Structures are given as C-alpha cells and as structure tokens.
C-alpha cells in the first residue's frame, strides 16, 4: 500500500526490517530501541489507521523525551483531503505530540526532509518527529542530480548538556565521605 516503496527500498539497500503485527507495537519498538541504544528509533507505518495506531507510542516518546522518527504513508497529493483511502490529517494529529511534523511535498526533498526530521529528534530536548510521505512522492523517480541531499556532517543537532565531570567527581567525593548520605534529585 502506501509505504510499499519504502519497504522495497530498505530491502534493496540492505536495511534490516523488523516487521511487527501492529503499528502501535512498531512505535513502541522505536521508542524502546532509542531508550536502549541512545540512537533515534524509527518506525514506518501505513496511512490512516496505521498512523493513528502509532499515536500512543509517539505520545509516550514525547512525554519521556525519547528521540524517534515515525514515517507515515499518505494518499497522493492530488487526492489529499478528498476522502481517498485512509486519508487523514496525520500532520495535524501529530503536531501536539512531536517536535517536528511535516509532509514531504516533492520527491526532490525526500532525503533532505528525512534528515531534517531525524535531526530534530535530538535538537535541544530530545523527542519524536513525524514525517508523512504521500504515495505519488514515493512513486516518482528523479535524477540523482535533482535530489536535495544534505551534506554528511554539515548539519548536526545540538546535544544535551552533560554535567561537568569535575563537579560530578566532587559530588561523588562528598557523598562517599558523608556519615549519612542523602541525595535529593529532581
């Protein structure tokens, strides 16, 4: 259906696919992957009910500041908001629970938009991004020279600030020497 070209592209490029039985499981798996590895998780779901089923996992990642990308299918741009099969306002639904939610409007921008969505998952406070890719955008072929491909390493998200190692060492020393240590963290 709506995401068949993404599935085939992953297979053609040797990208491992973990197929699950339900879209909610896919979004929770992407969240879990990010929690376990520290790298953004990614799930790809079909349009309509596939995207709505994934909402809970995305909302969970949003509240917990977990970096993940959900890519959802959509009907063709020419049929968008005309009641076509599984045509729902995915971006509108995702905006309140993501850091970034957008539709890819041209095949030329696919790589750029995927890169942008991934970057946003780790920009400032971590959190999920949503990218909707319509069927006709996925079906179109363009020469590589027309594709907007971001330069590797040119753009990067800011990272979370970590405590100064010297301060951590001082705190550990104070706690280890205390008679009755108590730590209150918030």
Which residue ranges define each predicted feature?
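N-terminal alpha/beta PP-like core and its mobile active-site loop of ThDP/TPP-dependent enzymes
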Residues: 1-186
């Amino acid at each position: 259906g709506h995401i068949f070209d993404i599935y085939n592209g992953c297979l053609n490029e040797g990208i491992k696919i973990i197929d699950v039985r339900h879209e909610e499981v896919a979004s929770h798996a992407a969240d879990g992957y990010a929690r376990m590895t520290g790298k953004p998780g990614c799930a790809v779901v079909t349009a309509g009910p596939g995207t709505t089923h994934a909402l809970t996992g995305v909302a969970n990642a949003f509240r917990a500041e977990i970096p993940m990308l959900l890519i959802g299918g959509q009907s063709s741009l020419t049929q968008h908001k005309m009641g076509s099969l599984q045509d729902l306002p995915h971006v509108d639904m995702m905006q309140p629970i993501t850091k970034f939610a957008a539709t890819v409007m041209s095949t030329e921008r696919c790589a750029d938009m995927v890169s942008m969505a991934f970057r946003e998952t780790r920009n400032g406070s971590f959190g999920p991004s949503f990218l909707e890719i319509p069927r006709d955008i996925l079906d179109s072929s363009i020469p590589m020279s027309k594709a907007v491909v971001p330069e590797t390493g040119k753009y990067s998200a800011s990272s979370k600030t970590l405590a100064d190692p010297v301060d951590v060492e001082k705190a550990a020393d104070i706690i280890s020497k205390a008679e009755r240590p108590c730590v209150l963290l918030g």
